[in-house]
Structure formats: structure tokens, C-alpha cells
Amino acid sequence: MNSLTKSINLDKVSYPQSTVKDYILLMKPRVMSLVVFTGFSGMWLAPNSLHPFISVIALICIAIGAGSAGAINMWYDRDIDALMKRTQKRPIVRGAIEADEALSFGLIMAFFSVFFMALCVNFLSALLLLFTIFYYICIYTMWLKRSSIQNIVIGGAAGALPPVIGYASVSGSVSLDSVILFLIIFIWTPPHSWALALFCNDDYKNCKVPMMPVIKGALYTKKQILIYSVLLFLTSLKPFFVGMSNIIYLVIAAVLGLVFLYYSISLFYDNADNKQAKRFFAYSIFYLFFIFLLLDFCRV
């Protein structure tokens, strides 16, 4: 039996009563935490001073916008989520929330996040938030994810936009500084996601999602991870050279980047199992959080 034909008819199952926890999980809280954190960094690194009320509203809107995109993503991907071990416990798959209910929830949150961003903050940040939600749902989830080996590379732009939104919410503009923040996340996303794809390769293959390890194999993927790791190392040093951060940032960012490179090289030469891919994946999360934390504390 074809793996896709084995997926559960999630629209016809009997659903138990939903809980608050189910709706929180529907919004992908781990992704939300990264989005909010990088969004705050964009706000903090903007040239203007932070307005307490507007800053809080902006962060809430960014969080709700990210949550809405996560909810609609789970609605659309419920068929393949049911087939993947990593996603089989998501709320729609296990019957905690109906598919139509999840879609309505996501759309309502998306509307209010953009509406209040425009009403209380500024139109530029609202437009950027709207574009980010649209890009993640329509360009990545509905189009690229299931059709292109470059799904993560191109689709990663959505995850890289929160600091730009945060920056625009304070400054009312987009500048070189915010573009550099975007580039750090944009270049970080492929190696991070491909490491996950390496140790979840069977799941992606089973669902016919054209992740790079599925189409090109592990060795080619590891080469790409190494290339992107070098690019990330170079990009992560740019904040110092454009006057965004001080020498402390440069030194620590260089060390973190070298460790990132070490893990990518170790992954490239690892032929045993997926342990090195899991180590690389775990470190990549730590790396991004710490780089943005450094930017916050070492700004000029």
C-alpha cells in the first residue's frame, strides 16, 4: 500500500474536547519562541528608542502572526504529519482539534495580528508581517515544500523576516542592519533544516517530501551544509564591520562560528549513524539564539 494512501482521513474522525494546551501546540511554540526572540533583537538593534507600549504590542503581533502561520501549516500538512513519527502527535493528527477549526483559528489570528500591528505600530511592519505569513503559508507550505528540493532555501526567507519586522516596528524603515539580521537567519536555515532531514530521512521519503537527502543523498547534503556553514561564519561577522556591534561580539561570534564549522566538518566525515546530524542540529539552535543574544548585549 502506498504510504500516502495510508494517511488517516482526519476530517472524518471523532474529536475529543480541545484544550488550551492543544491550541498552544497548534501554534508551534518552539518556533514562536525563536521568532519572538529574533523579532525583539530587531527592535533592540533599531536606532530609535523603544516605546514600552508599542514594543509590547509589536512583539505580541509578531508572536500571534507566527502562531497563525504555524496553525495553518498544520492544517495544510495534516496528511503528511500523520505519516511522520516526528509529527504524529500534533493536535490535528491525534484528533484534539478539527482541521476546519484549526484553519479558522489560524486565519483569525493572522487577521488580528496584522490589523493591530497596522493600528498600533506602523504600516510598514504590518505589511512585512502580512508578507511573512503569506510567504510561509502559500510560497513555502503550499508550493515549495512538496515540489522543490530548494524548499528550505527559498522558503527560509519567511523565518528570517521577524527581526526585519521588529526593526521596522521601531524605526519605521528597513536598513542594512536589518538586512544583515535577515541574512544570518536565512543562511542558517538550510544547514539547520538539512541536518534534521538527515536523521528524519525515512519520514520525508515516506511522505514524498523532496528534502535534499531524499533527492540528492546524504553526502551531497553534507557538502551543502558545509558550504552554508562557511557562508554563515562570514555573514555572522558582518555586524562588527558595519558598526552594529563591538569587538566582544566579533571574538565570541567567531568562536561560535568555528564550532559550527567543526560540527559541519564532523558531519561531513561521519558515515556511521545519525548521531552527528543530531548533534549538529542541536548546536545550530543554540548557535542562533546565542548569536542574537550577543548582538543584543554587544550593540554599539
UniProtKB/Swiss-Prot annotation:
Question: From which domain of life does this come?
Answer: Bacteria
Question: Can the keyword Lipid metabolism be found in this entry's annotation?
Answer: no
Spell out the family assignment given in the record's similarity comment: Belongs to the UbiA prenyltransferase family.
Pathway field: Porphyrin-containing compound metabolism; heme O biosynthesis; heme O from protoheme: step 1/1
Its name, as the record gives it, is Protoheme IX farnesyltransferase
Q: Name one GO cellular component term.
A: plasma membrane
Keyword list, A-Z: Cell membrane, Heme biosynthesis, Membrane, Transferase, Transmembrane, Transmembrane helix
- GO MF term list: protoheme IX farnesyltransferase activity
Membrane topology per the entry is:
Multi-pass membrane protein
A Pfam family of this chain? UbiA
Q: What is its EC number?
A: 2.5.1.141
Which residues span the membrane? 31-51, 52-72, 92-112, 123-145, 152-172, 179-199, 225-245, 247-267, 280-300
Which PROSITE patterns does the annotation name?
UBIA (PS00943)
This chain's function reads: Converts protoheme IX and farnesyl diphosphate to heme O.
- What is an annotated GO biological process for this record, any one? heme O biosynthetic process
Q: Which reaction does it catalyse?
A: heme b + (2E,6E)-farnesyl diphosphate + H2O = Fe(II)-heme o + diphosphate
Instruction: Fetch the NCBIfam families from UniProt.
Output: cyoE_ctaB, PRK04375.1-2
| Subcellular location per the Swiss-Prot or TrEMBL entry | Cell membrane
